[in-house]
Structures are given as C-alpha cells and as structure tokens.
Curated annotation (Swiss-Prot):
Any one Pfam family match given in the protein's UniProt record, by short name: PRP4
Chief place where the protein resides: nucleus
Location within or outside the cell: Nucleus speckle
The protein, known as: Pre-mRNA-splicing factor 18
Keywords: Acetylation, mRNA processing, mRNA splicing, Nucleus, Spliceosome
UniProt keyword Glycoprotein, yes or no: no
Family in the record: Belongs to the PRP18 family.
InterPro entries hit by this protein: Prp18, PRP4-like, PRP4-like_sf, PRPF18
Function text: Participates in the second step of pre-mRNA splicing.
Residue ranges that the Swiss-Prot or TrEMBL entry lists as coiled coil: none
N-acetylmethionine sites (modified residues): M1
Bilayer-spanning residue ranges: none
Lineage: Eukaryota, Metazoa, Chordata, Craniata, Vertebrata
Amino acid sequence: MDVLKSEILRKRQLVEDRNLLVENKKYFKRSELAKKEEEAYFERCGYKIQPKDEDQKPLTSSNPVLELELAEEKLPMTLSRQEVIRRLRERGEPIRLFGETDYDAFQRLRKIEILTPEVNKGLRNDLKAALDKIDQQYLNELVGGQEPGEEDTQNDLKVHEENTTIEELEALGESLGKGDDHKDMDIITKFLKFLLGVWAKELNAREDYVKRSVQGKLNSATQKQTESYLRPLFRKLRKRNLPADIKESITDIIKFMLQREYVKANDAYLQMAIGNAPWPIGVTMVGIHARTGREKIFSKHVAHVLNDETQRKYIQGLKRLMTICQKHFPTDPSKCVEYNAL
C-alpha cells in the first residue's frame, strides 16, 4: 500500500514539475507530457531547441498555379502584342478576353505556358515550317544586302548534281528487277535524286519576282518538304535495309517511269500505297491447311501508306516526283496520267 501511495505522489509531483495543469483544469493530454519529457531530455543532453518561427515563409508548392498566385509582383511585359497573339493562337486560346488589357493577356499567356507546355509541337504543319524557312532566307537577304553585279543565288534551292542524263538512266533501267537488289537500290537512289535536281533547277530558273510571290514561295517550300520526306527512304536505300515488299513496289514504279509508262507507274503506286487484299473475316487457319482468303494476304498486296508516318511521307514524296517526271519527260497522251497536284 505504501508503494502505491509513493508512486501516486511521484507522478503527481512529475505533473506539477512539468506545469501541465493550468488553473481550473484537472486533466492534460498525453502528447503534452511527451513533449515536456522530450524537451527535458534535450536539455540534459545539451541540445538547444530552436523555437518555430510563426512568420516563416510557406514551403514552395508543387502546384504552379499557387506559385503564380503567390508571386504577385508586377513583371515587365517582355513580349510584343503581336508575339502574344501568335502564341495564343498556336495554343487555340482567345487572343483577348472581355475587359482584358494587353498586360493581362501577357500574364494569361505566361500562366498557360507554365501549366500546359507544348505537347503537340511534333504535329505541326511541316509545309508551314518550310514556308517560314523560305521567308527567313529572304529576310536575311534584305538585312545583309547584296553587292551590285552579284548574282542572286543565295536563296536558290539545293541541286543534287548526279552527273548523269535521262538517257543513261533509261539504259540503267533495263536492268531493274533482274535480281540484283543492291544495284536496284543504287539506280532508285540515283533516279530520285536526279528528279529532285531537275525540279530544283526549274524553280531556280524562275524570275526573282516569281520566287518572291506567294505561289513561288509555296512551290519552293513544296520542293524542300519533298526532299525532307525522301531522306528516310534514301537512308534505307543507302544502308540496304529497305523492306523487300516496298523495294519491289518502288522498283516497279521506277522501271515504268524510266520507260515513260506513267499509267502503269501510277497503278504500281496505288498497289503499294492502298493495296487490294481484303482481310478475310472469321477463322483463316483451320488444321494444317489455310483457307482461301488467307492465300491473298501477302505483304505485297497490303497497304503501306498507313503503316507509319515516315512511310506515308516518303510515299507522298515519291508521288510528287512521279508528277515532275511526267512534266519534264512527256510521252504519248495515252500513257500519261492527268495530274493537277503541282
């Protein structure tokens, strides 16, 4: 009994020493006792407890909206109104809200750029990019000036000099599709670059005022775009890793183009781009024998234009070069295709 009384007295004395009970209060929280014991332990060990600063700045929020709202200082308007309008239109945002000033629109653009970065940059119109490059070349020419008597070739398109003629290429075309894949790829590369050079020379021969017109810039941009579309194809031809089905179709197209059989070349192009093999419905393999519809599903008969974006682009570039070839090397009307694309 004495032990129990002594323990009660000890705990009561501990509560009084810790100052846990205030006036008119008969209870305390266990967390307060634990906090007092922790402070006493730190004092015995010699640690100094730093008081918490109530006016301490809040931690940086992970939410960009809160960060922008906390930073209310007036930032200078670093963009012109025209640039703000252009960036807002690129993102599909209104250029001005009701009652909004130019500075408010700039602040709204700043918030949009922080919250929603450009995720569709790769899906922009590459023809527009080519046109912008042409315009920038003309601006550089105006800023840099031109010496009197100097020939204006600064903004001419790049010409692929293959040091060959159409007659030599037609002679090489006789050996296309004879089983030598490496030779076929070399002939395809040489002929396509030859057509790109012919197209570039035609555009470079225009008058200066024609080059600077809207249609002239569009034609130059189309040539640049086609050249960029065909780069992956040239890379595959150079590395000898062009898929066999596409290589076979392109070989037929080039062979017919060199023979000036443009209708047949167009048919081969459609065969490669669209295909004519309907996919069979239902079970195609039962047991060890294939059903009738299965026999028609070969890679040669299946469309390639929708396989991926890279294939679609160089197939489209090939179609443009077919138009250029027919334009510069005509034949009988019965063997020509009516093109209105270029």
